């Protein structure tokens, strides 16, 4: 079984209770570089594998990470894939569940707090407000071609 767990953004205590419990019980912890390293201490008996990726600096390819998830799950190990923020907000969680489905590996998702929500909130800025904004948009600074549209309006 593989659990894709969002670590939240920033401090270790922003992870969900469910995410923390899974870290404590897992056999293998496969983690990104953007997590608070204090979370690693909760996986006392787990095999810990860093697969951290940042723009332009990848310790492992996504294909290698996907294969590692499948390999460890096929060894009948409980695997936590710990990702910064939320697994499905620019976290490649979608790519990982596609690989798990193709490998016939059971999985579950534990959402995390995305910086897209947390940063403005911690600064006291609501991302929506009934009187001024009914929606908000999250846009990456990186595209497949590393080019943002020139016609994107700023508000």
List the predicted regions and their residue ranges.
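Class I S-adenosyl-L-methionine
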Residues: 1-7, 12, 17-113, 118
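Beta-strand/loop-alpha-helix module characteristic of Rossmann-like adenine-cofactor folds
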Residues: 1-5, 107-108, 116-155
